[in-house]
Amino acid sequence: MHKTNVAAAVLLTVTGVCFAQPPGITREMIERALPLEGAPLAEPGPYKITSEPAFGSPGLHVYRPETLDAFPKKDSLPLMVWGNGGCAIDSTRYSGFLTTIASHGFLVMGTVPVEGAARRQENADDIRAAIDWAEKENARTGSPLIGKIALDKVAVMGQSCGGFLSIMLGADPRVKTIGVFNSGVQKPAAGAPPSPFPTADALPKVHGPVLLINGSDPDFMLATSLATFDMIDNVPAFYGARHNAGHTATVFHPGGGEYANVASNWLLWTFKGDKQAGAMFVGKNCSLCTNPNWDVKSKGI
C-alpha cells in the first residue's frame, strides 16, 4: 500500500458508513476476519460482568466486575480504555471482546454515542476523558468504585484507527502499556500536510511496553504493524501476526475470540504479575512463539 493511503485506510466503517476508503482498500479487505469454525474460543475470567453508562459522562460506557468485594484487598482493578475501529464512537460493537477482558478483573471503558450530539469520530481526548473519569470516580462519595481502581495500572488498547489513538495515548504519563491491533505508524513523509494521526515521531514518547498484533497476510496493515515494531527502540515490545485473521480478525467472534485472550493475558501479566498469562509472551518457548498459527517477534520481553 502506498504510504499516503495508510492513514486513510484505517478510517474504517463508522456505524456502517465508510468515512474514507482509498483506492485499493475494499470493504471486503476491511471486514476480513478469521473464519469462526475451528477458531480458538474466548477464555473468560472468574468475574461476572456488568456493563453500564459511566456516571455523569453520557459519552462513556463501563464494563466491570458485578461484585467488587475482592478489590483492592484480594485483587487489583486496573483500567483499560479501548479505541474503536474506524475511530467510531460505539464501543458496544466490541462488547463481547471487552466483557471477556473485564471478566479477568479489569475496569474496561469505551465510548458510546451521545443522543442529539453531532456525529463525529473518536479522538485522543475521548480516551483521556475516560481516564479522567476513572480518577474522579475512584474518589467520588457514593461510587461503587471508590478506592477500588488501580490508577497506577492504566492501559489503552485499540484496533485499526483506534490503534492510532492508543499510540497517541502512550505519551500520557498515566498510561503504562498500550495495545495496537491491526494498526501502526510510518515515518512522516517529507512535505506531507499535517495529519491528525500519529507518525513514527510518536514512538519515542511511548514509555511503557507495547503489544502489536495483526491479522497477517490478509490484513492490509501487516507491513505497517511490523514496521512499527521494528522502529520501537525505547520500550519492550511484542509483535504477533495471526495467520489468516485479516483486518477484523476475531474481535467480533463470541467473546472476542483469540484476540480477547491475547489482550487479557497481556494485561494480566503486565498489571497483575500473572506468570501463566505471561507465558504467552515470554521466552523462546512462549505459547504464541510455538503456536504454528502465529509469527512473533519480541524485544526487551
State where each predicted segment sits.
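Short glycine-enriched nucleophile-adjacent loop
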Residues: 163-172
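Short beta-strand element of the alpha/beta-hydrolase
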Residues: 74-85
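Gly/Ser-rich "nucleophile elbow"/oxyanion-hole loop immediately N-terminal to the catalytic nucleophile
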Residues: 69-76, 121-164
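Alpha/beta-hydrolase-fold serine-hydrolase catalytic core, especially in secreted/extracellular enzymes
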Residues: 235, 244, 253-301
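The feature captures the conserved acid-bearing segment of alpha/beta-hydrolase catalytic domains
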Residues: 176-253
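Short amphipathic alpha-helix adjacent to the substrate-entry channel of hydrolases
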Residues: 92-110
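N-terminal cap/lid segment of alpha/beta-hydrolase-fold proteins
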Residues: 22-75
